[in-house]
């Protein structure tokens, strides 16, 4: 089914330097309007972050594409997402790997995301209501960890759950935030600063 708005979004992402055909195809295939409030549907394919309630947002499509591309995913990659939010980033990951593990601290957001994923026939996702700072150690280690909220510093518990050779993409900072790619190599963590970003804060604890 033709979607001119999705076509234009993919063209924009390509112009912004996103090159992975798999990432672009996953974003093109997903109806972003399904993950936003009805009042925001007319902006669903704009390159903007949009509110989803509970003080949280759905990230702008460029950031979703960039973070996903940085993880260099293959179908076998074992992925942990911190911050399920609307479920949009989760759905993009689920199009690219065999299984996604995702943690959300706000119960109502977790429920809504699970409902959306089910309605889109996306079943290769395990969701957990819990503290994102703690990750999901019982299911680790992970080849890739994607964090969708900004931490003042990288949580050690998440570094501990990264497999050898694994990649983490995480926004770090408070007033000034930067996206980092962290690779675990031989017991060390190699950190690369990618670009300036703006995310909601990664809050410890969970909410009913």
UniProtKB/Swiss-Prot annotation:
Its EC number is 2.1.1.77. It is found in: Cytoplasm. Transmembrane segments: none annotated. InterPro entries: PCMT, SAM-dependent_MTases_sf. Keywords: Cytoplasm, Methyltransferase, S-adenosyl-L-methionine, Transferase. Belongs to the methyltransferase superfamily. L-isoaspartyl/D-aspartyl protein methyltransferase family. This is Protein-L-isoaspartate O-methyltransferase.
């Amino acid at each position: 089914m033709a979607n001119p708005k999705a076509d234009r979004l993919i063209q924009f992402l390509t112009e912004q330097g996103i090159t992975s055909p798999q990432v672009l195809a996953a974003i093109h295939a997903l109806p972003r309007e399904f993950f936003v409030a009805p009042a925001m549907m007319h902006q669903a394919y704009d390159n903007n972050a949009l509110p989803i309630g509970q003080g949280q947002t759905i990230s702008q499509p460029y950031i979703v594409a960039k973070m996903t591309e940085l993880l260099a995913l293959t179908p076998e990659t074992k992925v942990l997402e911190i911050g399920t939010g609307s479920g949009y980033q989760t759905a993009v990951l689920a199009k690219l790997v065999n299984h996604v593990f995702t943690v959300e601290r706000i119960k109502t957001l977790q429920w809504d995301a699970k409902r959306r994923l089910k309605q889109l026939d996306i079943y290769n996702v395990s969701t957990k209501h819990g503290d994102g700072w703690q990750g999901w150690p019982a299911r680790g280690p992970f080849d890739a960890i994607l964090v969708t909220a900004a931490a003042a510093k990288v949580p050690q518990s998440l570094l501990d759950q990264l497999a050898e050779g694994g990649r983490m993409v995480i926004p770090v900072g408070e007033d000034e935030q930067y996206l980092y790619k962290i690779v675990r190599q031989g017991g060390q963590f190699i950190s690369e600063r990618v670009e300036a970003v703006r995310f909601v804060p990664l809050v410890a604890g969970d909410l009913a």
